[in-house]
Each structure stands twice: as structure tokens, then as C-alpha cells.
Regions:
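Phosphate-binding site recognition
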Residues: 1-291
Length: 291
């Protein structure tokens, strides 16, 4: 069941109702609910929902090609693929314009990781063709730093093309409380304080159990706790050197807040290297610097 996100849904609906091509950028931390939001938005509209993976660029192109071809054809030939990303994106300009078709490119940063030219190719096709259609394209990504640099940044090929964007943030207390109608106000607050406003984490708790039973079962249980290994899995999925990031986060959790203290606590002698790691963690919205 999809809960809340009324403001974000209305923003998407407003752009969908426009009389022009839309290039919407949605980004935010992993587990914050971006994909579920887009599924809810697309549910009653014609759409292609492509979720990129860490597979090869040719495999990604083949999967995308088959989804696009299947949008207007009942049967997709086995092994069908467009000859290039440019060819595949240009075909989007031929899709029926009424009702407005939605093309979602989820995990867009995975596409960029596999093919650095993707933003430039999309920029070219957008300028030459797609901007004059009735299409709505949504670029969605979890690696906030890369989305800001490669999609939204001044130096990015797609700079100036987006028609709207939003950073999807964790839910506030009022929205998070909607997950637990059976909890008291105190239990709702404790749950939100422990897991934050991340829908994926909130869904692991059940209000048929008291909040402390949920914490023991889902967070503290090393054998079967759904969230016990979540920090490790997230960092391993997103970063090349997770061991150093673990050490830095552990140092911060132990109360070290100055750069040299963090470097010493993490066992990393070079403060310049630590500063770079901290910057990446800030881009991922996993830590915040307060002066």
C-alpha cells in the first residue's frame, strides 16, 4: 500500500498536465521511496518503466529496447535491440502523444556508470527531437552526488533541459506515523526516531508488535534482522572502498567530530583522503556537517 507523498505526486501530476515535453529529475537517498512514488504516479497512465542495473551497457540497451518496442507492439521479437542508445531514444519521439506517454529511467546513475556518454546522447536527442513532443521523461537516481553533478550541474550536458526536479526527502513524523495506525503517539515517535522517515525501513516494523520487539527483531538480531546489515549493504552497493567509509562512520558514531579526530579514529593517516570520504558521505546524505 502506497502511503502519503501527496505533495510530490501533485508536482508530478502538474507536469504531466502541461502542454509541452517534460524532463523531470527525481533523486534522493536509496530506500527513500522514489521507485514506489513513480509506480504510483504511472499506474493509470501509458508508460515505459525502465530500471537500470549494473549489467553491461549492451544488456541495458537490449532491455530498454524491448520495453520501448513492447509499448506499441503486442509481440517483441526475441533478442530485439536498437543499434544504439541514440536510435532507441529517438524512437521515443514517435510514440503516440495522447495521452502523454511517460518514460521512466530509474537508477539513471547505473546507466551513466556503464556508459559515460548517456547524458550527452540524451541531451542531443532531447534538443533535436524530444523537446518538441508531448513526452514526459523522468530521470531517477539514488546517488545524489552523481545526479547533481552529471544531470543537474552547470557543467552537465543536460543542464538547462530539465523542466522540474525534486529531491525526495525522508518522511516527517506525521507522514511516518501513517504506517502505524495501531501505535500510540509515543510508539510512533520512537519508531520514527529509530529508523527515520525511510519508507522501506518503516515497512519492516509491524504495529501488531510493540516497538521494542520490532527493534530487537529487525535491527538487533544479527541472524535474521532485516536492517541489521543494512548499513554495510548500502555502502558496499554504492562505494568502491566501503571499509574506509565504515571506519569513518564508526569514528563519528564514537563522538569524533573534528577532521583530525576522525582520521585518527578511523586509522587513516591522510586527512585529505578523509576529507574526500566525508564529502562523498555528505553527498549521499548519510552525514551532515554543522558548523
Amino acid at each position: 500500500m502506497f502511503i502519503d507523498r501527496k505533495t510530490e505526486l501533485e508536482l508530478l501530476e502538474q507536469r504531466y498536465r502541461s502542454n509541452q515535453a517534460e524532463l523531470f529529475v527525481l533523486y534522493g537517498r536509496r530506500r527513500v521511496g522514489k521507485t514506489e512514488l513513480l509506480h504510483a504516479f504511472c499506474a493509470d497512465k501509458p508508460h515505459v518503466f525502465f530500471i537500470a542495473t549494473l549489467s553491461s551497457d549492451s544488456e541495458q540497451l537490449a532491455t530498454f529496447s524491448q520495453q520501448v518496442y513492447g509499448f506499441t507492439h503486442a509481440d517483441v521479437p526475441s533478442g530485439f535491440t536498437f543499434p544504439s542508445w541514440e536510435a532507441a531514444l529517438r524512437v521515443l519521439g514517435e510514440l503516440p502523444g495522447q495521452p502523454k506517454p511517460i518514460i521512466v529511467l530509474d537508477e539513471f546513475t547505473y546507466l551513466i556508470s556503464g556508459n559515460k556518454a548517456i547524458p550527452s546522447i540524451l541531451q542531443k536527442v532531447w534538443d533535436e527531437k524530444l523537446k518538441n513532443t508531448q513526452i514526459m521523461m523522468v530521470l531517477c537516481g539514488s546517488y545524489i552526488g552523481m545526479m547533481e553533478t552529471e544531470v543537474l550541474g552547470y557543467q552537465a550536458p543536460l543542464y538547462g533541459r530539465r523542466t522540474a526536479s525534486t529531491l525526495l526527502r525522508p518522511m516527517d513524523l506525521a507522514s511516518s506515523a501513517l504506517f502505524f495506525p495501531g501505535y500510540s503517539a509515543e510508539e510512533k515517535f520512537i519508531t520514527w526516531a529509530v529508523v527515520g522517515g525511510m519508507p522501506y525501513y518503516l515497512r519492516t516494523f509491524q504495529d501488531s508488535q510493540n516497538v521494542f520487539s520490532n527493534i530487537r527483531q529487525h535491527i538487533l538480531d544479527a541472524q535474521s534482522g532485516t536492517l541489521f546489515n543494512e548499513p554495510r549493504l548500502l555502502l558496499m552497493e554504492e562505494l568502491r572502498e566501503p571499509r574506509n567509509y565504515f571506519s569513518i562512520l564508526r569514528a563519528i558514531a564514537q563522538g569524533r567530530t573534528r577532521l583530525n579526530e576522525i582520521a585518527q579514529g578511523a586509522g587513516i593517516g591522510d586527512v585529505t583522503t578523509v576529507a574526500r570520504y566525508l564529502d562523498i558521505l555528505q553527498q549521499m546524505r548519510l552525514i551532515t556537517r554543522r558548523v
